[in-house]
Amino acid sequence: EDWDQVATDDGYIGYIQKKKVSAADTTDYKRSFKAEAYSYFTMDEPVNLAWHQVTSTDANNYFADTTQNMTGVNVISPTWFSVSDNDGNVSSLASGEYVMQAHEKGLKVWGLVDNFSENMSTTTVLSNTAARQNLENQLVTYALKAGLDGINVDFESLSEDVGIHFLQFLRELSIQCHENNLVLSVDNPVPEDFTSHYDRAEQGKVVDYVIIMGYDEHYVGSDAGSVASLPWVEQGVKDTLAEVPAKRTILAIPFYTRLWKTTEGGALTSEAIGMDQAQQ
């Protein structure tokens, strides 16, 4: 009872007489750490965006014809960039003339980059620091050369193992974008349990806009059904807004539907058709 068990800083345990133990000495430490404050490039008005499918440089020449009857849109996103190989190189269809014409019509231009090439692995590119940063550098260089207002990231069918690398890519790209006055947006599928690795909450901290791809509820190979039923879309919006501020969330809606047919052999087929054709 006259002894106290004590331990040294390096782990040795022993005993010392109580009378030789002084009162406890308490030191209060103040935290100097400050959480990082993020700033965002957002528009003063709601974003009304239209994606423009561009598959060749010649297609850029038809910008005026393509947009002559377009109303209500303030951002156009041409599909100009694609990751072409595992070194993070980018193929580009960008056109400064296209951007100039869009600006004359009062449109902002966000160049889209996809991961659709069969010659690259998204996991390989994004998990490799050199390849990932090469991708980021090329995107920003192309964007500045063409006079773009922003970059739209459309990386689809991401596996669970690439989730953390995708987020790191967005973090790094957002820094470069903001240093060069470029808006950064990212496309996401409607939230489901199997897409939780997209981590929309973390995305919402670093990108300017999170876009919900509110379509493909039913698709080729699935059961017959709506491309985007109202309850399904509403739930997707609700789940996204639980993680991302509403003012930086965009809902993308489909201007197409699917025509479902059953063959004589009983097989279910479907064909994507535009709204004009669907009305016929």
Describe every region a protein language model picked out:
Residues 86, 137, 160-279:
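Substrate-binding surface in catalytic domains of secreted glycosidases
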Residues 59-86, 139-151:
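Catalytic domains of carbohydrate-active enzymes, especially glycoside hydrolases
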Residues 100-151, 155-156, 178:
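Substrate-binding cleft of extracellular glycoside hydrolase catalytic domains
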Residues 7-46:
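Boundary regions of SH3-family modules and the immediately adjacent low-complexity/disordered segments
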Residues 1-2:
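Conserved beta-strand/loop element in small beta-rich adapter and peptidoglycan-binding domains
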